[in-house]
Amino acid sequence: NAVLHLQGDVLFSLSTNFSFFLLTHIFRIKYYFSKNNVYFCTRILKRVLIYYMVKDLLTPDYIFESSWEVCNKVGGIYTVLSTRANTLQEKFRDRIFFIGPDVWQGKENPLFIESDNLCAAWKKHALEKDELSVRVGRWNIPGEPIVILVDFQPFFEKKNDIYTEMWNRYQVDSLHAYGDYDEASMFSYAAGKVVESFYRYNLTETDKVVYQAHEWMTGMGALYVQEAVPEVATIFTTHATSIGRSIAGNNKP
């Protein structure tokens, strides 16, 4: 809704002259408009423009969202994701999957309810065929959406090859990286591999699928999905607090 309202406001601001044209010429209204009349009519036109703008939009069948803070409470992004999960679950009901880092290995994670039954066949396939070690369960928040936690540590062995691929394809420079860049990048890449594996095993090109990557820590995975699974639409959302925390935590100006 926020996006639609923003688009509407932009259309409203760009189409003010067009609105007056419609009011005075198409409808041939011949009396003098007061400010209230003009405002009322332009608001109506705004709604008409929005309707024609969004009437052909598609609703996805499946949604994947990845974030460093899925089942891993660090800061504000956790709040953003966890508070909207219940609404998304009501609409998509177990067709939305949150992907997070498996950073609680060997310890009990109070935010994660593991299940041996959820996606069991795919989980086995992912391990045996795609070399992905994942745990599947539910996020212990209202709505309890399905969560896939991926072990990204094995990807450190392929780090240089992954960075080379990112440079050759997208000119993403990793030579001057510092701090938590490597860890975030390996998780991001692993999350992209999870989407690819799940899609190839469970879904088809007739399914409308969206992958939303939250913050710079998941950007590399979004690039990977665009290349490896072009059937999946990608969205990248930045949360400025995370960038600031990374800069401050590594004593950078």
Regions of interest found by a model, annotated:
Residues 21, 26-27, 142, 230:
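Residue-level detector of alpha-helix boundary/anchor positions
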Residues 4-6, 24, 213, 238:
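Intrinsically disordered, low-complexity cationic segments
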Residues 13-15, 19, 34:
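Serine residues within intrinsically disordered or low-complexity segments
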